[in-house]
C-alpha cells in the first residue's frame, strides 16, 4: 500500500501542476505551483495513509498484538508517526525532478527552493500528526479517513486566500488575520517565500507535538478500556491546558526575534537606512497598495513583482507602526475610481486589458504616491517605497 500511496500522491501532484495549472505556460521559474497544490493533495491522501494506523477489527489484530508487547503508548505513537513521516519525506524527495525542471527552464532562487521544500516537509508532518489523531479518535477506517479530511480541510480553509477574501466582506480584517495564523497554508506560503521566522517553526512544532500528545492520551485510554475517562477530571484539565497552549503559543510566538533570510537578494532584510526611516514614521502612517490581483491576463512576471512588493510592505509593518492594506481595483468599481482619483496609473496591456500596481502613503492628511511600481525598477523597489515614506517624514 505504501507504493500505491506514493504513486497516487505523485500522480495527483503532477496532474495539478502540469495539467490543471499548465506549468509550461506559466512563464515562472519558481516552486509556487508545488506550494499551491501540495496542501490540497495532502488533504486527501495523508488521511488515507493514517486511517488504518489504529484499527483493530476482526481481520486485523495488529493493535491487540502491539498492546501485548512491553512497549509504552508514547513509543507506539512515535513509532507510527516516524514510520509514516519518513514515507512522506521519501515521497516528497521524488518531486525533486520538478525542481530540476524549474532550474533547467529558468534561474530560480536556490534559497527559496530550499525553503520551499522545508515548508513542504513541515506541512506533511503536521498533516500526518493531525490525521493520526483523527484515526485514533475514530478507529474505524472509513470514519478515520473522513475525520482526517474534515480536520485538515478546516485548517487549510483558514489559510486559503479565496476564503479570506470572502470572509473579509462580512467580518473585520483582524478576524481573518487571527484565523489564518492557525492554518498550515499560511506558514507554508511564508516559508516558501524564502524566509524562516520563529513563529512558523513554533506553529509546526506545536501542532505536531499537541496532536501526538493527544493521540498518546487517546491510545492510552483505549488500552485501559475506554475513551470517556479522557474527558473527566484532571485528564480534561490537561486537555484544555494543551489547547490553550496551542491557541496562545502561536500568536505569542510572533514576538520572538530573529529570522533567516534565504533569498539571494535578501528581500526580507531591510537596509539600515530603511530601518531609520521606519523608526521616524509618525503614528498612523498608512500605506495602500492598489494591485489588480484577480487579473487573469497579467503577465506572470508582474504578478511575481507584486508579490515581492507585498512581502516588502509586510516586512516593514512588522518592524514599525506602519499599517498597510491591499485594494483590488477591479473594472467599473468604486475601488477603481478611488485608485484613479489618487493618481494611480492604469497600465494598459497588449491584450487590451489593463491593471493597477501603485501605492499611496498617508499620514495626517498628507498624501504621497507611487503611481506605478515599474518592474524595470525592481532592484530599486525598497528605495522607491522608502523615498515615498521619507517625503512625509520631511514634511512633518
Segments and roles (model prediction):
Residues 22, 164, 189-198, 207-212, ...:
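Short, surface-exposed patches at the edges or C-terminal ends of soluble domains, predominantly
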Residues 16-18, 25-28, 41, 79-144:
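Secretory targeting signals
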Residues 11-18, 98, 151-162, 248-252:
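Aromatic-anchored segments of alpha-helical transmembrane domains
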Amino acid at each position: 500500500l505504501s507504493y500505491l500511496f506514493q504513486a497516487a500522491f505523485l500522480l495527483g501532484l503532477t496532474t495539478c501542476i502540469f495539467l490543471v495549472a499548465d506549468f509550461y505556460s506559466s512563464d515562472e521559474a519558481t516552486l509556487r505551483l508545488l506550494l499551491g497544490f501540495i496542501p490540497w493533495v495532502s488533504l486527501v491522501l495523508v488521511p488515507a495513509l493514517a486511517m488504518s494506523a489504529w484499527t483493530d477489527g476482526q481481520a486485523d489484530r495488529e493493535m491487540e498484538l502491539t498492546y501485548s508487547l512491553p512497549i509504552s503508548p508514547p513509543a507506539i505513537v512515535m513509532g507510527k508517526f516516524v514510520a509514516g513521516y519518513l514515507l512522506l519525506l521519501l515521497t516528497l524527495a521524488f518531486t525533486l525532478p520538478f525542481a530540476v525542471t524549474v532550474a533547467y527552464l529558468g534561474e530560480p532562487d536556490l534559497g527559496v527552493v530550499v525553503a520551499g521544500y522545508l515548508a513542504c516537509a513541515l506541512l506533511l508532518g503536521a498533516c500526518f500528526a493531525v490525521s493520526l489523531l483523527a484515526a485514533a479518535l475514530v478507529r474505524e477506517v472509513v470514519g478515520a479517513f473522513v475525520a482526517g479530511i474534515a480536520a485538515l480541510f478546516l485548517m487549510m480553509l483558514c489559510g486559503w486566500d479565496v476564503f479570506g477574501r470572502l470572509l473579509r466582506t462580512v467580518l473585520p480584517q483582524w478576524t481573518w488575520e487571527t484565523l489564518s495564523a492557525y492554518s498550515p497554508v499560511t506558514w507554508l506560503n511564508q516559508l516558501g517565500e524564502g524566509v524562516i521566522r520563529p513563529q512558523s517553526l513554533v506553529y509546526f512544532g506545536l501542532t505536531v507535538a499537541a496532536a501526538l500528545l493527544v493521540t498518546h492520551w487517546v491510545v492510552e485510554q483505549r488500552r485501559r478500556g475506554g475513551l470517556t475517562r479522557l474527558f473527566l477530571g484532571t485528564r480534561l484539565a490537561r486537555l484544555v491546558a494543551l489547547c490553550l497552549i496551542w491557541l496562545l503559543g502561536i500568536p505569542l510566538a510572533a514576538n520572538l526575534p530573529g529570522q533567516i533570510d534565504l533569498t539571494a537578494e535578501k528581500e526580507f532584510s531591510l537596509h539600515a537606512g530603511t530601518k531609520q526611516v521606519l523608526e521616524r514614521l509618525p503614528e498612523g502612517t498608512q500605506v495602500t497598495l492598489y494591485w489588480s490581483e484577480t487579473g487573469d491576463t497579467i503577465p506572470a512576471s508582474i504578478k511575481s513583482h507584486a508579490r515581492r512588493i507585498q512581502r516588502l510592505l509586510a516586512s516593514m509593518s512588522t518592524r514599525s507602526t506602519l499599517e498597510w492594506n491591499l485594494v483590488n481595483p477591479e473594472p467599473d468599481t468604486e475601488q477603481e475610481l478611488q485608485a484613479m482619483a489618487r493618481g494611480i496609473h492604469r497600465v494598459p496591456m497588449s491584450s487590451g486589458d489593463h491593471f493597477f500596481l501603485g501605492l499611496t502613503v498617508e499620514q495626517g492628511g498628507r498624501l504621497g504616491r507611487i503611481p506605478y511600481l515599474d518592474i524595470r525598477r525592481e532592484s530599486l523597489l525598497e528605495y522607491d517605497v522608502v523615498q515615498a515614506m521619507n517625503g512625509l517624514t520631511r514634511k512633518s
